[in-house]
Amino acid sequence: MAKRGRKEKDNWKKKRRQEYLEKKEFRYYIFCEGQATEPKYFQGFKRYIEDNPIYRDMVLIEIEGCQAETMRVIGKAEEYVRENKITKGQIWCVYDKDSFPSSDVNGVVQRAEVLNQKNPDIQYHAAWSNECIEFWFMLHFAYYTANNHRSEYKKFLNEKFQELGIGKYEKNMDDIFETLMNGGNPKLAIRYAKRIIKNGEGKTPAEIAPGTKVYELVEELAKYLPEEIQTYFKK
């Protein structure tokens, strides 16, 4: 009897969740390589969008920290879509090259292209960074093209954050979104990232060093921010 009760409760929860999802016109499922840096950054977008009376009832943003690298990130995304019977939405895989093989870094993009041919209602996107998401953060302060080790990016951020009077850069900063928005320049970061990708046209993600496509997800989410916050991201 208890098992039956639990099953009915689970079915009720699934039904309520499905009803909740159907009300959301725009759905974003963000799968992050790490469990701290990337999720905390995108939680900033989520907070402001959910406070925006124009879009909060129309936009769904779910953020998962995968604690996994490259191909395992998209693998976990596929598993989530399958297990939760997701029928519509944008699936974003946010991952770093770090020291992983080029075949794995490029493989996420290739796998996304294959999956996108199967179902036009569920589209996968690769928001990669070479070498790491700190490169995207760094572009908020300067145009940078030197292919240095990722430790140099963190050193750069340390110096900038100390100049701003907020101490050292930490990977688990709760206010990383606000820090970059107020202390840096998101509009410039987007422009710089696009320029780097354009200059690397015809190259694979692993060959564009340094480089990042995180800006694509940023531009997508920025559409739903409150108007006064959008001004930090749009021309």
Task: Describe the role of every protein-language-model region.
Residues G34-E38, C66-I74, A209-K213:
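Phosphate/oxyanion-binding active-site loops and adjacent basic polyanion-contact surfaces
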